[in-house]
Curated annotation (Swiss-Prot):
It comes from Candida boidinii. Its EC number is 1.11.1.6. This is Peroxisomal catalase. One of its GO terms (biological process) is response to hydrogen peroxide. One of its GO terms (molecular function) is heme binding. The keyword Membrane does not apply.
């Protein structure tokens, strides 16, 4: 480097040595090196140490381990007939994006190759503000009632007594909440261990609302990998976890550095509100998928990741996504799990990053932001709107408002009238097991996939107590009795009844 930077303190004062400390001399005794105490006035050293003590911020309670990159989204087909979002209004239009991939249950230092759903969150820096599409690599989820989420996540993490993963906790919760079966079958197929973040799809899971002046539609979005979908066996994933727990993080980084830019095609399924009412399941049920034959995929775009973050902490670790970050033309649906995420995600960002997390560069909208009441707070660093009045409607600060896009009065809209009630979505019916049964049939179309599901479940549940194992066999039998029987046979082969188990 021809002109290297000058080493300074955090306040810009140049210093002569990064590694010296100020101490009292020891020349009056036989030892010639300084032996006296350090001096409190040594700002360079104490400032460095104090900052080091505060380097870590709270990790995400879920999705703690992740990787991310910047890219570009391009509109490929006109879908203005179903969505008025401006970033979609012209074929060929491009929008900058940032995508973060992650595992869900593991801590920040856990393995990328663990059997786990993958987070797939993308921030679109549009001319109407930031749009966050906070998806997963599975089209369904474990729950449909948001009150269960904290309980569920606790059972997938560590036992509060041993601080170890616990097969009893894991399967105890799931078998008591059988609406989880669809996601569990997906997770314990080889799809639960993708080889690479580049080689997996992304799904909205939730239903959303897309709308324009003509009406509104219920939508479900799919990101289909142009690299194909490639998965590992249970043994391959376990081996890679031990040899290279950061493999998928580095795989994404290296591919982009080498110019092998990963890309995904973007599709949407839509139905009208009237069609939604006629389905044999609620479109607000996160444990269900929409049949493609009835609601075909419609192509609308493509995005490519082509730029690595310059600093992992500043950009990937501090990236803050939320499904409440929307733009005109797109809204959350009444899916109760989605509704709960609208609050929970920004709330955890305020906890992890501070109330002004949207001022962090990776989270900052590309367009001008004017919300005069959002002022002050920890780490307010954007000028705080100067002397502008800190309330809307001030006599000396006129503003303009954008008129909402209203659907035609002829278009049916959701209307509600009734009393407040306490409701838990705990009822389970036969349709909750129909789609898991169909998924088993889909696995049967590819050699070895059904066997892999049975093998993967048996490997995991063998560590549980026998009464829990029996519940697991019955749980999978709800989708197809064959599945429960096959799992039972393999578990008993691995862990014969009556054999002693050292659980610790």
């Amino acid at each position: 480097m021809s002109n290297p930077p000058t080493y300074t303190t955090s306040q810009g004062c140049p210093v002569s040595d990064a590694f010296s400390t100020q101490r009292i001399s020891g020349t009056k005794i036989s030892i010639k090196t300084p032996v006296g105490p350090l001096l409190l006035q040594d700002f360079k050293f104490l400032d460095s140490l104090a900052h080091f003590d505060r380097e870590r911020i709270p990790e995400r309670v879920v999705h703690a381990k992740g990787a991310g990159a910047y890219g570009v989204f391009e509109v490929t087909e006109d879908i203005s007939d179903i969505c008025s979002a401006k970033f979609l209004d012209t074929v060929g239009k491009k929008t900058k994006i940032f995508t973060r991939f992650s595992t869900v249950g593991g801590e920040k230092g856990s393995s990328d190759s663990a059997r786990d759903p993958r987070g797939f969150a993308t921030k679109f820096y549009t001319e109407e503000g930031n749009l966050d599409l906070v998806y997963n690599n599975t089209p369904i989820f474990f729950i449909r009632d948001p009150t269960k989420f904290p309980h569920f996540i606790h059972t997938q993490k560590r036992n509060p007594a041993t601080n170890c993963k616990d097969a009893n906790m894991f399967w105890d919760y799931l078998t008591n909440n059988p609406e989880s079966l669809h996601q569990i079958m997906y997770l314990f197929s080889n799809r639960g261990t993708p080889t690479s973040y580049r080689k997996m799809n992304g799904y909205s899971g939730h239903s959303y609302k897309w709308y324009n002046a003509k009406g509104e539609w219920v939508s479900s979005v799919h990101f289909i990998s142009n690299q194909g979908v490639h998965n590992m066996t249970d043994e391959e994933a376990g081996d890679l976890s031990g040899k290279d727990p950061d493999f998928q993080t580095m795989d994404l980084y290296k591919a982009i550095e080498q110019g092998d830019y990963p890309s995904w095609e973007c599709y949407v399924q839509t139905m009208t509100l009237e069609e939604a009412k006629k389905q044999p399941f609620s479109v607000y049920d996160l444990t269900k998928v929409w049949p493609h034959k009835d609601f075909p995929l419609r192509h609308f775009g493509k995005f490519t990741l082509n730029e690595n973050a310059q600093n992992y902490f500043a950009e990937v670790e501090q990236a803050a996504f939320s499904p409440s970050h929307t733009v005109p033309g797109m809204e959350p649906s009444n899916d109760p799990v989605l509704q709960s995420r609208l609050f929970s995600y920004p709330d955890t960002h305020r906890h992890r990053l501070g109330v002004n997390y949207s001022q962090i560069p990776v989270n900052c909208p590309m367009r001008a932001v004017f919300a005069p009441q959002i002022r002050d707070g920890s780490m307010m660093v954007n000028g705080n709107l100067g002397g502008t009045p800190n309330y809307a409607g001030a006599y000396n600060c006129p503003v303009q408002y954008q008129a909402p896009i209203k659907a035609s009065s002829k278009t049916p809209e959701e209307q509600y009238e009734g009393e407040t009630l306490s409701y838990d979505w705990t009822e389970v019916n036969e349709y909750d097991f129909y789609q898991p049964g169909r998924f088993w049939e889909v696995l049967g179309k590819t050699k070895g996939e059904q066997e892999a599901l049975v093998h993967n479940v048996a490997n995991h549940v063998s560590g549980a107590d026998e009464f829990i194992q029996d519940r697991v066999f019955a749980y999978f039998s709800k989708a197809n009795p064959v599945i429960g029987d096959l799992i039972r046979k393999e578990v008993l082969k691995k862990s014969p009844r009556g054999a002693s188990k050292n659980k610790f």
